[in-house]
Amino acid sequence: MASIDFRNKINWHRRYRSPQGVKTEHEILRIFESDRGRIINSPAIRRLQQKTQVFPLERNAAVRTRLTHSMEVQQVGRYIAKEILSRLKEQNRLEEYGLDALTGPFESIVEMACLMHDIGNPPFGHFGEAAINDWFRQRLHPEDAESQPLTHDRCVVSSLRLQEGEENLNDIRRKVRQDICHFEGNAQGIRLVHTLMRMNLTWAQVGGILKYTRPAWWRGPVPDSHHYLMKKPGYYLSEEKYIARLRKELQLAPYSRFPLTWIMEAADDISYCVADLEDAVEKRIFSVEQLYHHLYHAWGHHEKDSLFELVVGNAWEKSRANTLSRSTEDQFFMYLRVNTLNKLVPYAAQRFIDNLPQIFAGTFNQALLEDASGFSRLLELYKNVAVEHVFSHPDVEQLELQGYRVISGLLDIYQPLLSLSLNDFRELVEKERLKRFPIESRLFQKLSTRHRLAYVEVVSKLPTDSAEYPVLEYYYRCRLIQDYISGMTDLYAWDEYRRLMAVEQ
């Protein structure tokens, strides 16, 4: 196995206008400080304040949004990164691993990956994702393109139907149909950072948010060696060339992951498990006492000094000992969070170090907190109680169904733009308004300028006389609609749906 040298992974170069003549530790750190500024000041981060964590359209500011959740993940990620570096320093291995001059960038990449990890999520979270994918599947039917051309291909777009004698073009059609029907928040995050926002971040920083390594157009089973890393789509066909360059710059083998991404993932796992339960208590779905009993019974067999007693039991006893009963909730979650972090962060850090050869190679095929340990069991306990008692609550399910309907309805509203012929849509893009298409013209005007420009830029580079042109033009037109709707906040999507459905003035 190749030696571990993080100087080959923490690549501070950029896709465009890359800094030259960088030599000192301070100069390298300044480059990553620039990344921090670009990320923190980006509109994509600001929009997280009105996107769902668990409870859509929530007016109670004490309940988490995607932004407050991401800030908490950022802090936990920083904690894990510092713990890793501290342990490596104690073992005199920082220099051996090429980290002696890169501790600052190491921490910064992890922090900013944590802050960005949800930026691609659509309104209403996973139900927004499901709505987008279901809507496009019902029109493109990618499963009908799996075999040789079918006489009963249900795809409503003629240019995407498989044709006899067009093997190469049919491969592209299959890719496009599969890709469009696999919208995913992590893949959209890559697209936002590179294509839409043009943030021009360092290669290492973007590597930190490439959580899954499966292309969205992938068909068939994934290799056993990468089944975890490829369990979801990680990037789209539209970013294929960029990801290929990213892999080259970060020395990543096909379908392998950037090492620091495991830290971001662990920070997210630790953060949301406790946060979801705290938000449920804030929403009065259950009381702290009820939550404790849910956790107690779900744990199963109890022993003195078990991990449950050291973490959950300790938090419960300390919160009850507080004479200010009105603060029991705050006290319980403060102790629960502290106890959880004090157990899981050192464990995650040690797992990273113990498995560093595989992690550095990008092939460690599981999460840091996914094993047979009691620490993994504790996280699963939090998740299972949330699934059983929070996500299945009627109020939560009703909001999720409303979110699904809103996103589906918005796609229905913008569908006329996808129904235009290639020539008609091209003319609409050039002139921005066409008298013979009054509805389509008004819908086109509502699209974000940023998204329209991204479409124009990529389509203008396609050779118009090639057989691929109609297929790829339609692909990028679908991306345009997905970009616009997925970029909305929950409140904007809700209001836009009501306005366009004439529910309110």
Curated annotation (Swiss-Prot):
Gene3D superfamilies (alphabetical): Hypothetical protein af1432, putative deoxyguanosinetriphosphate triphosphohydrolase like domain
Q: Name one GO molecular function term.
A: magnesium ion binding
Q: Name one GO biological process term.
A: dGTP catabolic process
InterPro entries cross-referenced by the UniProt entry: dGTP_triP_hydro_central_sf (IPR023293), dGTPase (IPR006261), dGTPase-like (IPR050135), dNTPase_1 (IPR020779), HD/PDEase_dom (IPR003607), HD_domain (IPR006674)
Q: Return any one Pfam family short name.
A: HD
Question: What EC number(s) has UniProt assigned to this enzyme?
Answer: 3.1.5.1
Stored PROSITE patterns: HD
Superkingdom of the source species: Bacteria
**Cofactors required:** Mg(2+)
Q: Which UniProt keywords apply?
A: Hydrolase, Magnesium
State the CDD domains in the record: HDc (cd00077)
What is the catalytic activity of this protein? Answer: dGTP + H2O = 2'-deoxyguanosine + triphosphate + H(+)
- Domain HD: where? 66-273
Q: What NCBIfam families has UniProt attached to this entry?
A: dGTP_triPase (TIGR01353), PRK04926.1 (NF003429)
Which HAMAP family does the protein's record reference?
A: dGTPase_type1
Describe the subunit structure: Homotetramer.
Q: Which family does it belong to?
A: Belongs to the dGTPase family. Type 1 subfamily.
Q: What does this protein do?
A: dGTPase preferentially hydrolyzes dGTP over the other canonical NTPs.
Protein name as catalogued: Deoxyguanosinetriphosphate triphosphohydrolase
Q: Which organism is it from?
A: Salmonella choleraesuis (strain SC-B67)
